[in-house]
Amino acid sequence: MMLSPDQVSLIGLVFETYVMEHHKSDIQQILQENTEDLHYPVVVNAMTLFEDNMEVGECFNAFPSKVLPIFDNALQRAAQAISQSSSSSPQDTFRLKHNMHVRISGLPVCPELTRDHIPKARDVGHFLSVTGTVIRTSVTKVLEYERDYMCNKCRHVFSVQASFEQFYTFTPPTSCPSEEGCGSFKFTCLSGSDAPPAACKDYQEIKIQEQVQKLSVGSIPRSMLIILEDDLVDSCKSGDDITVYGVVCQRWKPMFQDCRCDVEIVLKANYIEVNNEQSTTALVLEDIQKEFEEFWDSHKHDPIAGRNEILMSLCPQVFGMYVVKLAVAMVLAGGVQRIDASGTKVRGESHLLLVGDPGTGKSQFLKYAAKITPRSVLTAGIGSTNAGLTVAAVKDSGEWHLEAGALVLSDGGLCCIDEFNSIKEHDRTSIHEAMEQQTISVAKAGMVCKLDTRTTILAATNPKGQYDPNVSVSVNVALASPLLSRFDLVLVLLDTKNPDWDKIISSFILQNKGAPSESLCLWSMEKMRAYFCLIKTLKPRITPEANTILSRYYQLQRQSDSRNAARTTIRMLESLSRLAEAHARLMFRETVTVEDAVVVVSVMECSMQGGALLGNVNALHTSFPDEPCEQYKTQCEIVLERLGLSDLLQRELQRLSGLQNGRPGSPKSPQSHSEHRNENTTSTNHSNQELGLNWFHSLSSSSNITSNNPPTPVITSTQNATTPPDMTSRNQQQQASVWAKSADVSVEEAVQETVSKKLRGKRLKEMKETLLLSKDDDLEDIFSHSTPMKNSKRKNMADTYQESGEDLHDKFTNFTFKPREKMSHANASTSTSAPEKQKRKIETDSHPPAEGGRANKTLRMETHSKNKTCIESEKDAIIPEAPKKQGVKKNNSSLRPPAEGSRAYKILRMETQNTNLTPIESVRDSMKPEAPKKQDVKKNESILCPPAEGSRADKTLRMEMYNTPKDVSSQLLNDDSSAQKQMFEDKEHPQQLLSRLNALSPGENDDGSNKKPLKTDHPKAKVASSTLAKLSRFSFTGSSEEQAGHKTVQTPPVAANGGVNVVATGSEKQENMTNMSMRREISDRQEDDGETAGRKRRCFELGSGGSAGLIKGFSLFSSSVLDDEDFDDVWNW
């Protein structure tokens, strides 16, 4: 069907009237242009045109190829009419243009006219709009679309149009078209090789591809050729998202004999609308700029809160992750590109690498950033090659063309690469030039050129296996140092399995079902896109103060011992400058201030993974602060004090004070997730709390947050844990735990501690006035891993530490305390006939006078260490058959009574007189050595070599020991067994003892070469016989570091006569306390003679449960004189 002449004239008249009414100003502007040979478009909205005249719309949809030339002719007549009728201005100002074209846009949104997919054969001849992405652009060509021919017979000249369907080839005429009808078929082409072409125009072909997000499931994107002519040439470039308005046509190459005709479908474009530039063009609107200016004017007293409001609108489906959102926003804002004095171009785009465990939201940030950026490409590293990332050479129609890759397609925009470490190594090195020099040099298929890649790269990758904080980031992600140094920021997101974080995230996802919450404070995606396009037009300048902070921080990073060589290069200083400019853009400022520099240093510290200021920060667990100004104040103090810029700190704090004084009220953070945080966040001040500096706010209970003390963030140190300066909460926890343990300890319980002789001696030396303390004393100043003790005792020990200025916490951090089971004491039932006076006497023995000498304190400690199973322990002692001479000498010397007039003799005599025991002379007479009889020798051998447990001899021995007079038998048994045991130990470990003796200091060496009697600091005091009796179970080596066995404290039942009742129960034998003073005399004798053996490690027990022990509740772990060298045993708690 063809249009009639009447329809053609009607369509032309209607369109001319429409143009004169709606586009008169556009035509006048075109007529004022000086150049007449250019092609000028007049964009006409199809919806408006069809509303004015429906018949024109119907004809246009039915015959678009016929109607469009009619529109162009009508436009020419309208322009001529406007030029002639204009009398307000001189005629010479309007120049008639012959190349004016009508461009149709704004088709009705319906499936018949608007397509998201590539048209098919049934769409041929229809005017459609197709949306896609430009993947290839060809070079611009000169197209000859018309030729002049002359008839050789009648000399008639006529024009021949090139056939679009046959790739603009010319078909020679078969007959003369003149009216005379000469019938000649011979013609001469006037546009020969010598003559210039009569009519030419620009021609270009581009290829578009369907957008992936608009495809159905499982579909592969298809592509289509678009024909551009005249003013449409070079209107778009590779990577642009465009909407093409045009006519779907078929074309084929000229047919030849025995050649198959290949028909292809192309779209002859009438108008191209670049979707990327829509947001940019909308920025010129004054109302949008005014809206953003009013927003920042409302936050002039707290600009950080306004910035956080923008960050909350960035990827709102991800909860928290404050540092990551801030870093992504600064990267999207970008810095200012500049050219230095030497002419070298310094890039302004920043690059960001997100390294994290699976499920930490890395891909969500990449997708959102690609959506709000006008020009972006999103790809994955697993399917990317060198040619796919840079450029590929493709041969099409006998010619080589360059197809742009992901980096070239994203020129001037954003390139998001997921799974960055999946790119092959030789392909990964190809993007080095694109990231730093922002160009790609190509030498392929005879084409040598350089393409621009002025793009921002936002990459995400998973660590290689489990992230190891002890190695560098390049090893964890398997990326080379040259590539890693090109990233301005590298944020590590570690999933530390924090229970509070898991609870918040699960509640946030389930309650909102993954959708962003409906909140008035969140910006829409269109508004975010418009804002980031607007701030990219700003060009902030760096102030000298900001330059000082950035340069000082760079120098500090270079001098850091734990610095990463791949990150701390000169590129780091350029990155700091770019990020500072980006933050100034984000704050809608034209100047880079101290605030921008401090924030950039804070984010860089999170990126360095072992920074010079605070170490490591897990960016995953950072959330938005309730008081942004207070958080910035804390950051400012930490950064500037560490950098030594106190003058800048004072000025900045004054500026912040002025802002706070000027604002009407305290700023409230419009955190969209605050409800979830307040409802679901519990206090994280428990034993497994992750500690860190007050750097970025994170999980914390709202009740524990004050304005003066910013909340401690829940961060995970990836290398070395950083101890926070404020340990108040931890001390409170320890105080509560210690008191809880103290409350659970009953009178029957005691705690077993294993210590060395040297440690025990030092402990006894310093315990003078630490017996009775109040229960309500504070434990905050004493950090102890020991057993619970009385509060009054802790108070005195705390005062001792305050006076000495020592930090016991530091002393105990290098030791490991191993828990052991506590041993319960049996309740010793007191005899009903025991008077109250005797009970008070035992308590008095438990607390001797504070002014007692060293010997008195030693006796108190040793008395406390009596074991109830002494008889069984004697059975295990192995007695050598032939003791050495030294051992025999020791045994003989240990049995000698003290000399008359000696110090030990006077003490022993006084004690025996006070207790009405056997006189000392009788004891000495009974202990004189004499030739033993055969029967006695046999008895001694049976004692020294105990029979097997449970045998008849064992039972007989027990009965004999029970019935033996309690004057000398138990003394002989203990003395002989202790001497033989000491002799065996000397024989069994000679090398070990010798090495330990040589390692001692001269003042501590008590071997045979230094046989000097030890002198105590204080004179020995009087000791009760009951105390001496309990020492009979221990062997003393003559050293100041007394030996003690691994015993369990038991309080013997008190009898009416002042003695001790004997309980004959299998393993429990308690001896009579009479005639036991000889043991102390023998011990003193050994000290005077100076005959000692090597150091041996023994254990003793301290009771903390009540009155069961003689020394109540002392703990060696709280000693104020403990040094690292004192801990020569394995500590057990």
From Swiss-Prot:
Basic and acidic residues composition bias: residue spans: 922-941, 1008-1020
Keyword annotations from UniProtKB, A to Z: ATP-binding, DNA damage, DNA repair, DNA-binding, Helicase, Hydrolase, Nucleotide-binding, Nucleus
Keyword Transmembrane helix found: no
Localization annotation: Nucleus
Gene Ontology terms for molecular function: ATP binding; ATP hydrolysis activity; DNA binding; helicase activity
Residue stretches spanning the membrane: none
Domain MCM: 304-509
Pfam family membership, one: MCM
A GO term from the CC aspect: MCM8-MCM9 complex
Compositionally biased residues, Polar residues: 719-737, 826-835, 1024-1042
General function of this protein: Component of the MCM8-MCM9 complex, a complex involved in homologous recombination repair following DNA interstrand cross-links and plays a key role during gametogenesis. The MCM8-MCM9 complex probably acts as a hexameric helicase required to process aberrant forks into homologous recombination substrates and to orchestrate homologous recombination with resection, fork stabilization and fork restart.
Subunit organization: Component of the MCM8-MCM9 complex, which forms a hexamer composed of mcm8 and mcm9.
Record-linked PANTHER family: DNA HELICASE MCM9, DNA REPLICATION LICENSING FACTOR MCM FAMILY MEMBER
Protein name: DNA helicase MCM9
Species assigned in the record: Danio rerio (Zebrafish)
